[in-house]
Amino acid sequence: MKHRIGRVETQIQREVDDILLKDVNDPRVKGVTITGVKLTGDLQHATIFYSILDDAPDKVEAAQTGLDKASGLIRREVGQRIRLFKVPEIEFAQDKSVQYGARIDQLINEVRRKNLE
């Protein structure tokens, strides 16, 4: 069962990324990248993680609002593209691991600079 959940998560990620590129015309979601999908064990709820290039708070909030507004369209399109008994409810969440990784890189570079001095 876990293998199936992983396959469905990957397929949903691929489809949502494609839907955002081709079908959603909202300028607030331009530059949004889908980084992962987490499904519940019963496949009823999906949390879709995204990152955005410009991580300014107002841009992140606008992207979240745009994704929330487009969630009905995205859910319908996912249901048409993927054969599932029931299409999961979709919730979007910002993926903070990208920011965390950038902060780690910044700290490593600072340590290297201090060691060179």
Swiss-Prot record:
Primary subcellular site in the record, as a coarse category: cytoplasm
One GO cellular component, as annotated: cytosol
Keyword annotations from UniProtKB, A to Z: Cytoplasm, Ribosome biogenesis
Domain of life of the organism encoding this protein: Bacteria
One record GO biological process: maturation of SSU-rRNA
Entries under SUPFAM superfamilies matching the protein: Ribosome-binding factor A, RbfA
Cell location: Cytoplasm
Any GO molecular function: ribosomal small subunit binding
Pfam families, per database record: RBFA
Subunit structure: Monomer. Binds 30S ribosomal subunits, but not 50S ribosomal subunits or 70S ribosomes.
Function as written in the Swiss-Prot or TrEMBL entry: One of several proteins that assist in the late maturation steps of the functional core of the 30S ribosomal subunit. Associates with free 30S ribosomal subunits (but not with 30S subunits that are part of 70S ribosomes or polysomes). Required for efficient processing of 16S rRNA. May interact with the 5'-terminal helix region of 16S rRNA.
HAMAP family in alphabetical order: RbfA
Stated family: Belongs to the RbfA family.
Protein name: Ribosome-binding factor A
GN (gene name): rbfA
